[in-house]
Curated annotation (Swiss-Prot):
Entry's transmembrane regions: 7-27, 44-64, 104-124
Name the record gives this protein: B-cell receptor-associated protein 29
Gene name of the encoded protein: Bcap29
Superkingdom, natural source: Eukaryota
Stated family: Belongs to the BCAP29/BCAP31 family.
Keywords: Apoptosis, Coiled coil, Endoplasmic reticulum, ER-Golgi transport, Membrane, Protein transport, Transmembrane, Transmembrane helix, Transport
Length: 240
């Protein structure tokens, strides 16, 4: 195995190890998010993007080269030509075909796992953010529920107070009705008393008029009696 393919194979093994490490169930996404949030990653972010694209290009080139080698050594004409020249050429061609196929698988899976690794890191980051947002939303929901319960309790208190106010209002209305009825009764009684007083005043005036008439009649009769008495006395004196 040449140095370049040994490096690609080592890169493939490292990718497999990282993918298995990311898939461990006892390491939560929040822990990976903290690791990804180190300041060193921010400093090499621009370099990392360039390196990512460079590695993809190199792996694509190696993959295409491996495809070319596989097609080259898989050709029937090449195998027959080598077999006709040297008897051991067939085994040599098959060995090169095996190496080409191995290199094809190494470069292909390295390219595939490299893309999977990038996507896996993105998904872990998004999952950690979603979990954090879920925690924040859970806290907000709990606070909202507490506030809603508090508002409901205050609403019940207000309803109870309103009911008490309504009861007091009904009592006040009943008392007001009673007072109005008492007022009407007092007005009726006052009117009756006023009518009775007016009638009594009229009776007094009538009696006063009658008394004056009787007094005048009495004075007239008394005057006539005096005159008659004087006449009688005068007649008695004349008869003597």
């Amino acid at each position: 195995m040449t140095i370049q393919w040994a490096a690609v194979a080592s890169f493939l093994y490292a990718e497999i190890g990282l993918i298995l490490l990311f898939c461990l169930p006892f390491i939560p996404p929040q822990r990976w998010q903290k690791i990804f949030s180190f300041s060193v990653w921010g400093k090499i972010a621009s370099f990392w993007n360039k390196a990512f694209l460079t590695i993809i290009i190199l792996l694509i080139i190696l993959f295409l080269d491996a495809v070319r080698e596989v097609r080259k050594y898989s050709s029937t004409n090449v195998v027959e030509k080598n077999s006709a020249i040297r008897p051991s050429a067939f085994e040599h061609t098959q060995m090169k075909l095996f190496r080409s196929q191995r290199n094809l698988y190494i470069s292909g899976f390295s390219l595939f796992f490299w893309l999977v690794l990038r996507r896996l890191v993105t998904l872990i980051t998004q999952l950690a953010k979603e979990i954090a947002n879920k925690g924040v939303l859970k806290i907000q929901a709990e606070n909202t529920n507490k506030a809603a319960k508090k508002f409901m309790e205050e609403n019940e208190k207000l309803k109870l107070g309103l009911r008490n106010d309504n009861a007091e209002e009904h009592l006040l209305e009943a008392e007001n009705k009673k007072l109005i009825e008492s007022k009407e009764n007092l007005k009726t009684e006052l009117k009756k008393a006023s009518d009775a007083l007016l009638k009594a005043q009229n009776d007094v005036m009538t009696m006063k008029i009658q008394s004056e008439r009787l007094s005048k009649e009495y004075d007239r009769l008394l005057k006539e009696h005096s005159e008659l008495q004087n006449r009688l006395e005068k007649e008695k004196k004349k008869g003597l």
